[in-house]
Curated annotation (Swiss-Prot):
Binding positions for ATP per the UniProt entry: 9-16
InterPro entries in the record: P-loop_NTPase, RapZ-like, RapZ-like_N, RapZ_C
Purpose of the protein: Displays ATPase and GTPase activities.
Pfam families, per database record: PapZ_C, RapZ-like_N
Protein's name in the database: Nucleotide-binding protein Bpet0443
UniProt KW Transcription keyword: no
GO molecular function: ATP binding; GTP binding
Family (UniProt): Belongs to the RapZ-like family.
Matches recorded under PANTHER family: RNASE ADAPTER PROTEIN RAPZ
Binding site for GTP: 58-61
Keywords, comma-separated and alphabetical: ATP-binding, GTP-binding, Nucleotide-binding
Listed Gene3D superfamilies: P-loop containing nucleotide triphosphate hydrolases
Length: 290
């Protein structure tokens, strides 16, 4: 059966990185496909016996974007195995990436008036407006603080999972970097004892045994994990019945290194029976340097 992955989202958020990863994974990839050709291309891929296809669609054909949600719905209704991933990033990060790459935003010419070149921020704002209907319907990955290597790993984990009633993701993050925009539920664990103030534990992470042992020694830590797990076990069935395909549970502490990482790892153990289950750590850990 043909599997289709559609990559879309804000320009500068990492669509090219995601598409290259899928190409390396054996997907037949096409970039910047106009929406009007999407159904025809997928039908041709099916007739040619292809098994995996990845397509990137961006804002360069803005007049057609309004049709994309309807096209996706129609293709799914016809039995197409279609997974849509929407990549996003905060405006500050996008502006920084454009500055580093020295590339023009694809909407620059569209917004030019009387020889006046629009600002990058104006282009980003218009693009957000154009893509908002699609963003609200699909799985969103906020790439603001992800390295290219982390994004490749996240996309790989996501597409390798068969389409389930609900993909459950636990992710840790640092409040000092902001709450990730892809989070459906956010739990603040900054009230828990902080290993950062123990000099021997400071360079470690919540995945290291000394930190895990230290945190497990506090009753309040176990109570926090029990309460979060209890909430999820009570309400996961309801989220599933709501035809939701993804649920991202974000756990945050100050630096995203100790407490949130530990809590995420413990929750992953408690929900190990849920398939598929994804675990993400937004703060770059020592073995995530690529």
């Amino acid at each position: 059966m043909l599997k289709v992955v559609l990559i879309t989202g804000i320009s500068g958020s990492g669509k090219s990185v995601a598409l290259r990863m899928l190409e390396d994974a054996g997907y037949t990839c096409i970039d910047n496909l106009p929406v009007r050709f999407l159904s025809e291309f997928v039908a041709g891929a099916r007739d040619d016996g292809l098994e995996r296809v990845a397509i990137a669609i961006d804002v360069r054909s803005p007049g057609e974007l309004a049709e994309l949600p309807g096209v996706i719905t129609a293709m799914r209704a016809m039995g197409t195995s279609l997974r849509v991933v929407f990549l996003d990033a905060n405006t500050h990060t996008l502006a920084q990436r454009y500055s580093e790459s020295r590339r023009r935003h694809p909407l620059t010419d569209r917004l030019s008036r009387g020889g006046q070149t629009p600002s990058l921020l104006d282009c980003i704002a218009l693009e957000r407006d154009l893509l908002a209907p699609l963003r609200d319907q699909e799985h969103v990955i906020d790439t603001s603080d992800l390295t290219p290597g982390q994004l490749r790993a996240w996309i790989r984990d996501l597409v390798q999972a068969d389409r389930p009633p609900l993909v459950l993701t636990f992710e840790s993050f640092a409040y000092k970097r902001g709450v990730p925009s892809d989070a459906d539920l956010v739990f603040d664990v900054r009230c828990l004892p902080n290993p950062y103030y123990d000099r021997t534990l400071r360079p470690l992470t919540g995945r290291d045994e000394p930190v895990a042992t230290w945190l497990a020694g506090f009753e309040i830590v176990g109570q926090m994990i029990d309460d979060i797990a209890g909430y999820l076990r009570r309400w996961l069935p309801q989220y599933t019945q709501d035809t939701r395909n993804y649920l991202t549970v974000a756990i945050g502490c100050t630096g995203g290194q100790h407490r949130s990482v530990y809590v995420v790892e413990q929750l992953a153990l408690r929900f190990a029976e849920h398939d598929p289950l994804l675990v993400r750590h937004r703060t770059q850990l020592p073995d995530e340097s690529t």
